[in-house]
Amino acid sequence: MSSSTYSPIPELNRLKEFEENVYPEAFSDGFELFEYGDVSSLGSDAPTEMRDGLIPFAQANHSGSFYALWRREDRADLATVPVIFCGDEGDLYIAAGNMREFFRLLAVDDADDADDVPARDAYISWLERTFGLTPVEDPAALYDAVLLEHGRAFCDWWLTFDDEDSIIEDLLDELTDLEDAQGARG
């Protein structure tokens, strides 16, 4: 990996190249890559377990929320680990199960922000040309699937260093509801 390489993840490096090519135009509202692995966004008092387990890589909005990779199961290929949303107002959730799912979510069109993302069409074309991917058609269904797949493990991991987090309790409640609904359909 050269010193000019953004990250150890080829997919993320390609996104960085795309972002640089369309800059200053936005391709997803509020999204912007920042220094890969910059743990300062976790806060100076973040526990070691959090600093070791999360790899921040992008701002999610204009007010301090960010995305981070969750080093799940010590996977060597970081493009296969879940992407976590860490909100500036305390929100915390699993945004995508892996990097390519995340890229698809970035392409979702929100009619309210159409004027703020002039490079969205260029991004969608790039996404299809580069990875053969299209925008997620049903973000809520993807969220549910990702929560079912990774939610319990993520909450268990988070609770190893923060056992009084109401956001995690909410995630666990949401996960239990999803599991119950899935069992009822079973």
Regions found by a protein language model. Give the residues of each.
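An amphipathic alpha-helical core segment
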Residues: 111, 115-155
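Solvent-exposed, non-transmembrane amphipathic alpha-helical segments
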Residues: 77, 103, 119-122, 178
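A surface-exposed partner-binding patch
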Residues: 1-79, 136-186
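Compact, glycine/acidic-enriched structural inserts
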Residues: 81-119
